[in-house]
Every structure is written in structure tokens, then in C-alpha cells.
Amino acid sequence: MKKNEKFDLKLILIWPIIASVITIFLEEKNIFYQNFFVSIILFLALPAIYLSFRAKQYVLKTLIVSTLGSIPIMIVVEYLGQISGAWSFPVSIFSFKLFGFVILEVLFWAFFNMYYIIIFYEYFLDHHITKHLWEPRMKYLFWGLLIGFVSFLFIIFNFTIPVIPYFYFFFGIIVFAIPVILQFTIYSHAKKVLVKILKASAYFFYLSFIYEIVALHYGWWGFPSENYIGWVNILGVRFPFEELVWWIMLFALAVLSSYEFFDDNEK
């Protein structure tokens, strides 16, 4: 690892703590009211933008993959999650909601979360520069997402969507668990890739855990339902077991597993 990369890694490693300290200071001193949107900037956007300046060669590809892979899926997931009461966002700075349910902050959250994961992975671990921005496999992801999203629009405009019991549990299996299981079984021979994915995921476990604790403490989001398979009580906050497994533990693993399959080289 180069000297500048070592410095950047040290900065990125302590950034979740810096973001938390800034949040606590601003909240306790009543200097500035924090909200979900501001938290996205602090915990995700700022470090992602910083790495973008340090790793310009990966930015365009990461932008394309993150936009394609986050926005359509998040709209569908958020719509169904809100209907089913899987989670809630008490405050939004935007009065407009997509399709009456989807706040715009979740789209920023999904995009910057995915973007940060991929740019971190490329800059610190993968170092894979390609001459083209679109791998052949990406067309399958593109068409799959397009067909899925158009089908979603057709359904919500023509039918009443029912409440889905234990929605968080079932959607997590499809979106997070399956990509990770496939990556670690079908591509078990690609040990170097698996190690890199695990290293990146370890950092995002640490980041997401801190982010979760701070977010729940200040009420940036919550979990109003009882349709969860269990609860985690820690450091004065309470969140579903699904949140621990799907987002905190497996989100980065799922993103990078899908990224390696569709738009990287599995090497």
C-alpha cells in the first residue's frame, strides 16, 4: 500500500468516530439540528467524495454501477417497507414523496452507501482499472432491473399492495443473503476476491454499527412494527435482528458480491 493510501485508510478508519463526535457536539450544543439527510452527508457522502478525489480513475464506473444498482431497487424496497411498517423515518426535509411513500433521503442513502462501498473497495483493495465502463454481464442486471421496476410500476398503479408480514426478513434473504451465498459457493475458488470482499465488509460493519447506534439515539429512523424475528438491545437503543444481519453485517458483502459478478472480473 502506498504512503498516501495508508494516510487515507487511517482517516477513513476514524471517520465514523469523527462523524459521531460532530453529531453529538452539534446536537448537545443545539448549534445545528441533525436529521437523516445531514447524517447521510456526514457518515457516507463526505468520505465517499474524499475518496473520489483520491481515486478519480474509479469514479465514473462507480457512479454508473451505484446509480443503476441502488435507485430502482431502493424505490421498490422502500415502498413495500413503508406499506408493511418495516421501518420509519420521522422527519424528512423534503415534502415530496415518490408514489406517496418513498422519501427522497432514502435514495441518497442507498446511492452513497453503495458508492462508498465500491470506491473504498476499488481504491484500497481491488485496484482494478478497466478501459471500458460496462462489462457484458451488466446487460443482464440492467434488463433485470428494468423489467422488475416496470412490473412494480404496473402493479402499484393497478392493484392494492397488501401488507407483507415479516417483510424485512424475507426481502433480506432475496437481496442480501442470496448474492452472498452464491459468491461464497460458486466462486469459492476465487479466494483472493473473497478475502478482499471480507476486508471491505469488516470496515462497513464497523461503520454501519456506529451509524445505527447514533441514528437510533437521535431518532433519524425507527422500527415501529413487531414483525421481526427478534430484537437487539445494545448501548441504550433497540433494533431488529434483521437490521443487524441484513444491513450491518451483510449489506457490503452483498453489494461487493454482486459488483464482482456483474461488473468486475472475479480476480
Where do the model's predicted regions map?
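Aromatic-rich, lipid-facing transmembrane alpha helices and their immediate juxtamembrane interface loops
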Residues: 1-267
